[in-house]
Structure formats: C-alpha cells, structure tokens
Amino acid sequence: MAHTFSCSADAPLVRTTGGSVRGYRFDGLDIFKGIPYAKARRFHAPEPAVWDGVLDATSYGYVCPLLEMPKPNGEMLVPHRYWLMDEACQNLNIWTPALDDAHRPVLVWLHGG
C-alpha cells in the first residue's frame, strides 16, 4: 500500500533548543523524523546539535554504519543496509497526536547494535 503526504503552510512547526523543526501530518498524527540530538564526534563527548533556519523533518535520518553481511540471509538480518549510512546517526523520530501541553505517555526504543 502506498502512502503520500504533502507539506503545506499548515505543516506542524515546533521550536526546540536546537532550532525550529517542520514535520508533516498523516493519519491524525504530527510526525517528525531525523531530528538530530547530538553532533557526531568520534571519541569525544557529545555536543548538542543546533541548526539555523527550519529543519526539514519529513524523512528519516542516517543509520549508523554497518558492516556488509556476506551470508545470503543478510537481507533478513539487516534490511536497512541500503539506507543512507553516516556517523551523523544521532537522530530521533517523533509521532504525536497533538502539539499542545498535555501530558502523554512516551515510548522510548533503544535499538541494539
């Protein structure tokens, strides 16, 4: 099933400590993808990510670099190996039913690897 969305003047826009972020609405949710939460600095303490202007948060950020899997079942184990990889993979994705001050449950998923 294909899904489409469009960014328009009423696309959700939020201000964060790093800068402004514009997402999109789909199926009753405000969605923000690929928001950086730290700078990629190998072997150094993390630094907050900041940006000028409005960050386009309508697509996923980079995934962390992975080694190629030489076995035939590699597709099943690492299906995202075709996604864009970069050390700047410190990003998060947010789905929320509304942009207000209501208290809502939060699910945090820390992936392995």
Which residues does each PLM region occupy?
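Non-catalytic accessory segments of hydrolases
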Residues: 2-113
